[in-house]
Amino acid sequence: KYGPATGKTVDVLVIANCVALENRIFLEHVLYNNSSLLVQLGLDLDEMAARMAGTPPAGWPRDKRVWQNLRQAASPAGPLSVISPVVGFDLDRFVRANLDGLWNQADYALLDSAYADNFTFEGPTDRKFSGAADYRSLLESMRTAFPDLSLQVDEVYWMGNDVDGYLTSERWSATGTHAGDGLYGPASGREVQIWGITQHRVHNERITAEWMLFNELDLMMQIAAAR
């Protein structure tokens, strides 16, 4: 799949969002940082995306039914912050508003108001940094590539308390048109599907750490297929 063995050691971030009932997982979404894996193996991402799009795996690209099923929530039917609002710090509302503001509204002031000064970030394809500047650059490059990008939050889960802090997991999906040059090469006009999982560490109502993956290699394959 990835060519001859290289003997290289790789370090690949994996994020899983599991839903369990009575100590049994009945729904699991997993994202592997496959684009980072390819880079660590010394492979060219654009070449690999084009090759894989030319000989795609079974079930690719996703049809509308599969995509809509992916975007559905397991339970509850609506956000808890709407169904059962709380007094004080509402973590469900906080993380939903953060994702909507950053990705849909381009409200980059949230990087100062919702995040700690030196928050850490680990994301797709070896993106690791601290602080707001690099994160804003990533968001702006995505907005340039997909000017009409529209993200919806599919599910939110969390654990913790106001004293010790919280850990959150947000599963999300987005659609957009590759109408801008830049991050993924010249505009292709391709309508794309993006899905991701973002996890946060939250303390004193500020995000202190974020781990985020989305289907970047798959996204590059979608664009390559349109060329």
Please identify what each model-predicted range represents.
Residues 1-227:
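C-terminal and inter-domain tail/linker signature
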